[in-house]
Amino acid sequence: MRKFTLLLIALNFFFGCAGDQVSKQGSKGEYGYSLDSDVKVPMRDGINLATDIYFPTENNQRLSGKLPAILVRTPYNKQRGSVVSNAAIFFTSHGYVTVYQDTRGRYNSEGIWHMLDDDGRDGYDTGEWLINQSWSNGKYGMYGTSYVGGTQHAMALENAPGLTTIIPVDAMSNLGYYSMRYDGAFELRFWKWIHWAGQGGGRQNAKPEMKKMLGDFIDVENRRKYLNKLN
């Protein structure tokens, strides 16, 4: 909870325009929420990205007026249980519209996943869509760890419209240097991550045999057998 409190302090600082719709920092706020699931957000090439939008409510009615938003773009499933819902409900309770999106080719989103390659353009298009919604005050911030931090860097580099705050934690930065290799050495942990993360792609979910193959490589013995064949 302390981390959430510190994050809310930062968001309130950068979102000074939020007005009296946003409560003071602290524990859970005064508002309830309603959820629009799998909203299709169009990209410039016609691909639609699945997006969940949590709206603050009062007396079971959505708050009126223009509100700030928090955007999270993730390859790890926007509906990943309590980790997501608790954070979304927390921020929404303080008057923020909270937006979770599956990145391209992941889970319920269309397209093919290319690791962080499309996230700048897709993030820009998502931000442009967001600030043009009737409920938006034109400003939003982002937060998240690891790859979710990398999507923030990608959007910042694209100068995404309306983006006022990023809080990347332990985020990916230079994929050419800190990805498959570290100072020239192949990173086995990253290879394991690829097979684990690969199971969540839209194409993989549509092809059970592909999903099983990727899952089998998570087992250390299977990976060892494969690597031994490369010698």
Task: For the regions a language model picked out, list residue spans one by one.
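Alpha/beta-hydrolase fold nucleophile elbow
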Residues: S134-Y147
